[in-house]
Structure formats: C-alpha cells, structure tokens
Amino acid sequence: MLKIKDFIFQEDWGDRRSCFMFFKADQEESASWAVDIGFKPGDFEGNEISPSICINPIDTDKSTVKELVGTTFSVKTVEESEEREDFFYIYENEPLIEYRIEVLDIAEAKAHIKCNGVLILDGYAEPWIEEKFEIDSWIPVIESVQDWDKLAL
C-alpha cells in the first residue's frame, strides 16, 4: 500500500513490477538488496497514475535474505538519491528528497517493507512540489531468475 496525501494505491505484482531482490556476495561484489514496487493504476488529483518506486542496490554484510529483517537504510538528500539513481515515478521519474526504508519481515518468499519519506510530486514546478509518502507492502523475494517462475510471476 502506498499513501500520498489521502490517495491510496495497491501493489501490482503483474509483469514483475514489484520485488525485493537479494544479491549474494561473490568474489567481486558484496551482498546487496534492492526494492522495486509498482502500484496499480488509481486516481490522483483527477489523473489516473500508476506510481512506482525504485531503490537501487544497498550493500550489506548479511549473507542470507532472512538476516535482513530489521535492516534499515536512509537517504537524506536529493543529491544522494540522484547519485544512487533511486527514484519515484508519478508523472515522470524523479529523485526522492529523502526516505527511510525498513525490512520488517521475510516470510513465505515475501518481504514486508515499510518506507516513508518525501518525494518530488512535480519536478517542473518552480520550485518543485514536494509531498510526503508512506509505503507498507508485502512483495515477492527474488534471489535468482528461477524465483519468478517458482512464484508464478
């Protein structure tokens, strides 16, 4: 569930739009995790939109996805969000102003994610228009390409 102002959007698991990805460490890269959540179309201030958030890989010292329960990560500035290439899509991809994401639980191949922050609602406005958002979602855990098929996604 995504809440922006009084508008609510539900997760969209179709077309592999939503997932919690865990990448195991290898000889060249440390372990990391990432989050993509697409939301079903809905009304937002008279427009039908299909918002999404992309949080790119976050390095971790954890060796299994289950160990990530309780993990948090924060971005405090637009510049940091731009550097990481994290974004929120409403009308167009925009960096986030700030956010905090937490892994609340991992159960039955799903991750319970909570993310709160401030997004850029309209990047064309001068100055841009900001708005708070809240996400509380269960999304599929993907550790390998085969997981998509196992989860029938």
Describe the predicted segments one by one.
Residues 1-9, 98, 118-153:
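Edge beta-strand at a domain terminus
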Residues 12, 63, 109-111, 143, ...:
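Residues in flexible loops and secondary-structure boundaries
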